[in-house]
């Protein structure tokens, strides 16, 4: 049984829609395998669900290099920092914050070790999970400028949403909840 199938089996019956969406996600071929699993790794890391992270990373190792997996994790870790900062700048009433330099190190964005549009797509997925509108707009603009189409962008965000819903369903089930189909 694959790591993703093991996660599927842990999703409780109250989250049947989540199971169906996970099945659809795994069958979807809109994204290349590297893009797909990069979105899944970055999104799983953004959920902070250790079981989901381990399963997705294990599955990703069959289609991604260790460098690409590390880049997806780097996307999640640096983007969450930017999400918190820029969401604050956007929501704060004081306009002075918009004029201040962020002073946040983020060199990995300039040299992620993988195709920049892949890294940008993974970053968009994380920004979508974290709800940073400024970041979402910036990633979407960069992707469009790189020639990435709307369907690819929407698919990455849909995969991020499904990944987040899987994490929530697993957490809501708790450790002693019955497995799917029990």
Curated annotation (Swiss-Prot):
It catalyses: N(6)-[(R)-dihydrolipoyl]-L-lysyl-[lipoyl-carrier protein] + a hydroperoxide = N(6)-[(R)-lipoyl]-L-lysyl-[lipoyl-carrier protein] + an alcohol + H2O. Pfam families: CMD (PF02627). InterPro entries: AhpD, AhpD-like, AhpD_core, CMD-like. One of its GO terms (molecular function) is hydroperoxide reductase activity. The keyword Oxidoreductase applies. Keywords: Antioxidant, Disulfide bond, Oxidoreductase, Peroxidase, Redox-active center. One of its GO terms (biological process) is response to oxidative stress. Transmembrane segments: none annotated. The active site is at 132 (proton donor), 135 (cysteine sulfenic acid (-soh) intermediate). Its EC number is 1.11.1.28. The keyword DNA-binding does not apply. Disulfide bonds join 132-135. Antioxidant protein with alkyl hydroperoxidase activity. Required for the reduction of the AhpC active site cysteine residues and for the regeneration of the AhpC enzyme activity. PANTHER family: ALKYL HYDROPEROXIDE REDUCTASE AHPD (PTHR33930:SF7). Belongs to the AhpD family. This is Alkyl hydroperoxide reductase AhpD. It comes from Bradyrhizobium diazoefficiens (strain JCM 10833 / BCRC 13528 / IAM 13628 / NBRC 14792 / USDA 110). The lineage of its organism: Bacteria, Pseudomonadati, Pseudomonadota, Alphaproteobacteria, Hyphomicrobiales.
């Amino acid at each position: 049984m694959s790591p993703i199938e093991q996660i599927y089996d842990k999703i409780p019956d109250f989250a049947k829609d989540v199971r169906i969406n996970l099945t659809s996600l795994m069958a979807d071929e809109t994204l290349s395998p590297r893009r797909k699993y990069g979105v899944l790794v970055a999104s799983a890391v953004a959920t902070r669900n250790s079981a989901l992270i381990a399963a997705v990373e294990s599955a990703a190792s069959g289609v991604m290099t260790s460098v690409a997996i590390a880049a997806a994790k780097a996307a999640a870790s640096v983007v969450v920092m930017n999400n918190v900062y820029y969401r604050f700048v956007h929501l704060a009433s004081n306009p002075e914050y918009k004029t201040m330099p962020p002073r946040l190190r983020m060199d990995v964005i300039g040299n992620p070790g993988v195709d920049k549009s892949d890294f940008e797509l993974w970053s968009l997925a994380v920004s979508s999970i974290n709800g940073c509108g400024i970041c979402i707009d910036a990633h979407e603009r960069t992707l469009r400028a790189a020639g990435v189409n709307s369907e690819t962008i929407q698919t990455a965000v849909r995969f991020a949403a499904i990944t987040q819903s899987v994490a929530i369903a697993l957490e809501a089930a708790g450790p002693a909840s019955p497995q799917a189909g029990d």
